[in-house]
Amino acid sequence: QPLVSLRGNLGKKDTMMYVHISNTLYLSSYNINEQTVGAYYKGIEKRSPQAIEGYPSSLYNLALLLKDKGLYCNIPVCFTSSENLLDFQRQLIEERFQTKIFDHYGTTERTIRISESIKHDGYFEDPGYSINEYLKDRVISTSLINSAFPLIRYQSSDVVILKENTKDERVFIDRIQGRSGNCIKGKDGSI
């Protein structure tokens, strides 16, 4: 299935790259601006992807530019990760890409992975990935997938908010606050 990836895979020199073996169109998250939005749109439309993955801020910035140009894409599924997904970002991304977002959370150290439920009513732990504890809304995790150098009781500075009441005991995380950061917009309009 064709995929579009809008993450940090490409540097500032490369705008886009198509990899046949994985059927993936990589778009640079560093070069999203008024000069590249047309090429990004054409690349997406040419491949009719079934899914798009990316940083929420990158997807949102591309969605803003698509909105300015009056353009829509039709991509059934969107996967976000690595940053907080804010409600206003979700709304515009889903509108402009005509998609449904499924958010994911994980650490660079690969000690935990949490995924948004199919009903969009919270998050669940990916089975078999880690053993997790939630103390004062902080995540403490032990990896079950890293046999070379497992991290035991690894604590990140990310924050999750647990659900007070849940009908499905597997979906017990209300939202992920994570950490917040800033984006800087360059003179050329790139993020």
Task: Explain the meaning of each model-derived region.
Residues 1-30:
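Conserved AMP-binding loop of ANL adenylate-forming enzymes
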Residues 19-191:
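Active-site glycine/GP-rich loop and adjacent strand/helix microenvironment
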